[in-house]
């Protein structure tokens, strides 16, 4: 059985103190999980300042006593004041997926706009999976795309993804891929785009059900982007893409009201989950993205009251349309 946990360091102190605190928590957590028959299979670290923190984190992980599972590191400052927060996945079964957190070196990224950086990252992924006999269309189940200065650079990413998907045989007549496209950064100063790819090498197309919720959300291709709202796998596990306050016409709802947007996006997520045979009560964790850090106390209090037992992390990250003040993603189990 999968177990999702969000871990935070003790409050206060410099980054090196926060890192020591968090890694101690991770060691204790993995030891407790091992006693329940689960082992670590995935970690994502959210940093407040990747350029000053990522190298120290990577060095610390080299000496970490537990085998480091699939790993992602992104700058999306946690809004509870933590300098670093971790999302951990442990499982009683061996990992049945491949995870590639692809980044560009300074030399690769320098001088390239977001379109060309995105094309290069997709090409890197294709160069990895093709020798394994895998395809983007069938075996890539989920992506997370992080865009620095998303208000400026999102359009280039969208065009690149559309072009790659067309070349690889993905369209609105077949399917796209569940995804989050969100503001985020890496330690690379020239890198404007970074992509995490989740791949299931043994999956069949018939084992994926794409969730639409057309009563609440428009098809993404209606407004020129290419991703699925969510996907349900054969075992009932559901990945919900980054979801905002949108209606069936593709319009932003409740401009300027972050709580009304939160309620609407959760209504959208609930409708997607119901289509996949699940519900908000079966969500395993939430990742919450806020455009304006001033909204954190209001949103965090609302989520605590509505989902007091569901792990969550609330991050500073701008959504792809400026009018969207909040976006959320999650994973869920079947009823």
Regions found by a protein language model. Name each.
Residues 1-284, 289-335:
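N-terminal presequence-like segments and the immediate start of the first folded domain
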């Amino acid at each position: 059985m999968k177990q999702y946990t969000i871990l935070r360091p003790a409050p206060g102190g410099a980054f090196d103190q926060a890192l020591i605190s968090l890694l101690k928590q991770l060691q204790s957590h993995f030891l407790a999980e091992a006693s329940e028959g689960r082992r670590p299979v995935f970690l994502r670290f959210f940093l407040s300042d990747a350029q000053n923190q990522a190298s120290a984190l990577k060095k610390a992980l080299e000496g970490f006593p537990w085998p480091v599972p699939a790993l992602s590191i992104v700058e999306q400052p946690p809004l509870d004041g933590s300098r670093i927060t971790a999302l951990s996945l442990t499982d009683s079964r061996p990992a049945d997926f491949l995870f590639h957190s692809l980044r560009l070196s300074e030399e690769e990224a320098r001088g390239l706009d977001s379109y060309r950086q995105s094309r290069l990252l997709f090409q890197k992924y294709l160069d990895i999976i093709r020798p394994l006999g895998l395809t983007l269309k069938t075996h890539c189940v989920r992506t997370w795309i992080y865009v620095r200065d998303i208000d400026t650079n999102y359009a280039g990413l969208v065009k690149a993804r559309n072009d790659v998907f067309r070349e690889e045989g993905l369209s609105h007549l077949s399917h796209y891929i569940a995804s989050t496209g969100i503001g985020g950064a890496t330690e690379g100063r020239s890198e404007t785009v970074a992509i995490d790819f989740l791949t299931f090498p043994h999956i069949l197309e018939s084992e994926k059900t794409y969730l639409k919720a057309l009563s609440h959300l428009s098809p993404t291709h209606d407004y020129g982007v290419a991703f699925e709202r969510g996907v349900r796998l054969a075992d009932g596990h559901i990945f919900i893409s980054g979801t905002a306050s949108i209606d069936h016409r593709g319009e932003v709802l409740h401009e300027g009201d972050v709580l009304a947007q939160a309620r609407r996006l959760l209504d959208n997520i609930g409708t997607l989950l119901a289509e996949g045979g699940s519900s908000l009560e079966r969500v395993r964790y939430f990742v919450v993205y806020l455009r304006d850090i001033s909204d954190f106390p209001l949103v965090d209090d609302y989520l605590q009251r509505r989902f007091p037992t569901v792990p969550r992390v609330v991050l500073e990250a701008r959504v792809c349309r400026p009018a969207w003040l909040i976006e959320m993603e999650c994973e869920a189990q079947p009823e």
